[in-house]
């Protein structure tokens, strides 16, 4: 008992919340994982984060996840994979697959000539004298420009939701299935979550 207290199993040790950003390299990945082990960690969450320059969820990203899993297996750390959060979207999501704003608008305003968003909007529902409308992300008049930062998936579309599950879950299973149940402890995601800059309602 005393010996186990001095050197506990990895399930009793901490899990590092590893924010993966910038350009990942194989050597840096291996070094950081060895540092986790050296500092007494029992595992880590490999979390995609703001500033990531590697091609998530592309071939280079998958290669580097495999490097992580190989090194973690070698040193005895447990890994938690994190797909991109839902409904925040995924790197390949298109303007057509995302929502920008969901809004309740009076019919009088929506049907007036001054309501500029009408031509970029779809009416989702009608209640008495109001519409529930969605404005598509990235739709601006020709003379205006703006920055599109993320957005959220159109969860009203089953096909888009299935695409998210395919890219973020099923593809990971197919690619790394030999590690699930041993090195890969679980998959974690803070879903559902819409980032504050992309809340789809006023």
What function would you assign to each model-found segment?
Residues 18, 36, 72, 187:
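Conserved, mostly hydrophobic/aromatic
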Residues 1-12, 27:
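N-terminal carbohydrate-binding accessory modules
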Residues 9-13, 23, 40-51:
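Conserved, charged catalytic cores of large soluble enzymes
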Residues 6-8, 33-40:
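Acidic (Asp/Glu)-rich catalytic clusters
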Residues 47-166, 177:
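Acidic/aromatic-lined carbohydrate-recognition and catalytic surfaces
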Residues 10-12, 40-42, 73-79, 181-185:
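Short, well-ordered coil/turn segments that N-cap beta-strands
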Residues 23-36, 165, 169-176:
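Short, acidic/polar
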Residues 185-202:
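Carboxylate/His-rich catalytic cores and anion/metal-binding grooves
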């Amino acid at each position: 008992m005393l010996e186990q207290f001095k050197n506990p199993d990895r399930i009793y040790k901490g899990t590092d919340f590893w924010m993966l950003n910038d350009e990942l390299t194989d050597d840096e990945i291996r070094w950081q994982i060895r540092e986790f082990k050296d500092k007494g960690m029992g595992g880590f969450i490999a979390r995609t984060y703001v500033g990531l320059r590697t091609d998530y969820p592309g071939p280079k990203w998958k290669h580097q996840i495999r490097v992580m899993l190989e090194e973690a297996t070698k040193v005895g750390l447990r890994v938690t994979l994190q797909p991109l959060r839902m409904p925040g979207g995924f790197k390949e999501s298109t303007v057509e697959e995302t929502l920008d704003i969901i809004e309740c608008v009076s019919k009088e305003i929506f049907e007036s000539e001054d309501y500029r968003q009408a031509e970029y909007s779809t009416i989702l529902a009608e209640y008495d004298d109001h519409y529930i409308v969605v404005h598509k992300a990235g739709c601006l008049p020709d003379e205006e420009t703006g920055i599109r930062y993320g957005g959220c998936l159109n969860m009203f579309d089953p096909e888009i939701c299935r695409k998210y599950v395919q890219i973020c879950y099923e593809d990971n299973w197919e690619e790394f299935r030999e590690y699930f149940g041993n090195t890969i402890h679980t998959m974690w995601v803070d879903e559902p979550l819409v980032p504050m800059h992309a809340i789809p309602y006023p």
